Amino acid sequence: MSSAAKKEAILRQFRQLTNATPQDANRILKAHGYRIEPATDAFFNNEQAQINASISSSTLDRKSEREVKERLNALFDRFRDAGADSDEEDDEASQPEDRDLISIGGALKMCEALEVSPEDVVFLPLSYYLKSASMGTFTREGYINGWKMLDLSDTIDKQKKTLEKLRQELLDNKPLRLERIAQEKSNPATASGANKGLYEKVYEYTYAFARREGQKSLALENALAFWDLVLPASPTFQRAGSQGTFTQAQLDLWKRFLSEQTRGRAVSKDTWMQFLDFTKEINSDFSNHDFDAAWPSIIDDFVLWVRDNMPASDGMDTS
């Protein structure tokens, strides 16, 4: 076998093992002297090459892509039209409909079809992947591209199965789908957090998602409701199958403190983001809190309030 033929055979073998693009396969093999084992190790240590492979493998031929898009467009129109009918019943003077937007009424119909409650935590990662900017609204572009990214889920049955996978990815804080990582990295505003797990990204996303239109901060009522929804899914939360230690009782104390002591003040983005870190570090009796660390003052105030209000019999160290 000639040298060129041998390299071609190695290239085919390497691509079968890794699904690397031709460009990445040639580059990596050349860098490692066409030795399969070190080249394979290099591929799996090269995040961009893996992203390229994922995007390439999910690229459909034109006919198949057109068929997937047609099915997703039909589903989008079904829920958009259902939402438009619902909105007209509720508001005779409704604004002219946007043909590329599913509204709240349509989102509820979508939930019915998927057999999932809009109050189910899995609706948050779904909204994240479908790039919903606010509760109960989906654009045509976000809907189609999101479901394509989520295992080409172009039927209701496929989407139901995908939701169960998505739920587990959230609970396990699995890495984002590679195509979404590539999108995050291409945006300077999100590039630094592109390698965070799905739960962390969804927790961050929820702050803007739950905000009322035109508001910079999150209304306390909404913050409490969404903490109730999203925190029990956190890897930091104590539940079956989790190594987390933050408890429902601690969350209840936090909610009580905010309700009783802050006069209904809206929750800042800094408080929302850092509270997740707080749940990772605090112990059961709050005795290990570091007041010299750069926590938002409201978290320091919360710990002081707990120490004043939790009975000594509950194990609180008040020294």
Curated annotation (Swiss-Prot):
Q: GO MF annotations for this entry?
A: cullin family protein binding; ubiquitin conjugating enzyme binding; ubiquitin-like protein binding
Q: Which Pfam families match?
A: Cullin_binding (PF03556), UBA_4 (PF14555)
Identify the GO cellular component terms for this protein. ubiquitin ligase complex
Q: Does the keyword Lipid biosynthesis apply?
A: no
Q: Which residues form the UBA-like domain?
A: 7-44
This protein's UniProt keywords: Ubl conjugation pathway
PROSITE patterns, alphabetically?
A: DCUN1
- Source organism superkingdom: Eukaryota
Q: Does the keyword Manganese apply?
A: no
GO terms for biological process?
protein neddylation
Q: Where is the DCUN1 domain?
A: 67-307
What is the stated purpose of this protein? May contribute to neddylation of cullin components of SCF-type E3 ubiquitin ligase complexes. Neddylation of cullins play an essential role in the regulation of SCF-type complexes activity.
Protein name (database record): Defective in cullin neddylation protein 1
